[in-house]
Amino acid sequence: MSQIDKAARRQKIKARSRATVHGNATRPRLCVYRSLSQIYAQLIDDESGKTLMAVSTMSKDNAGLQGSKSERSAAVGKQLAEKAIAQGISNVVFDRNGFRYHGRIKALADGAREAGLIF
């Protein structure tokens, strides 16, 4: 499968899942983006169109993260969950953004669940 086909497939899956996955202030959407070397996670309130918080491997808090990409993804998930719980958010809707639930995406989700987020 060529890179163009993979990108088009991911965009199609993303559009299909976004039709059913919505977040609000009490249960925001946990949106994940994975690049080749980094991972980004945001909590989004779709009703007001605002990003409540964002954490990534590029954040200043994560400047010294060591380990594999999966281990860093799990650390980002834990950090996001801790920030969310501090703001009173415990339930979220997980949006994998067209990526397969495998590898770094799964590691981030598991890290967030370990730290107390419910989804």
Curated annotation (Swiss-Prot):
GO terms for molecular function: 5S rRNA binding; structural constituent of ribosome. Residues 9-19 have a biased composition (Basic residues). The keyword Ribonucleoprotein applies. Signal peptide: none annotated. InterPro entries: Ribosomal_uL18_bac-type (IPR004389), Ribosomal_uL18_bac/euk (IPR005484). Pfam families: Ribosomal_L18p. Residues 1-20 are annotated as: Disordered. The keyword Ribosomal protein applies. GO terms for cellular component: cytosolic large ribosomal subunit. Keywords: Ribonucleoprotein, Ribosomal protein, RNA-binding, rRNA-binding. One of its GO terms (biological process) is translation. Belongs to the universal ribosomal protein uL18 family. Part of the 50S ribosomal subunit; part of the 5S rRNA/L5/L18/L25 subcomplex. Contacts the 5S and 23S rRNAs. NCBIfam families: L18_bact (TIGR00060). This is one of the proteins that bind and probably mediate the attachment of the 5S RNA into the large ribosomal subunit, where it forms part of the central protuberance. This is Large ribosomal subunit protein uL18. It comes from Chlorobaculum parvum (strain DSM 263 / NCIMB 8327) (Chlorobium vibrioforme subsp. thiosulfatophilum). The gene is rplR.
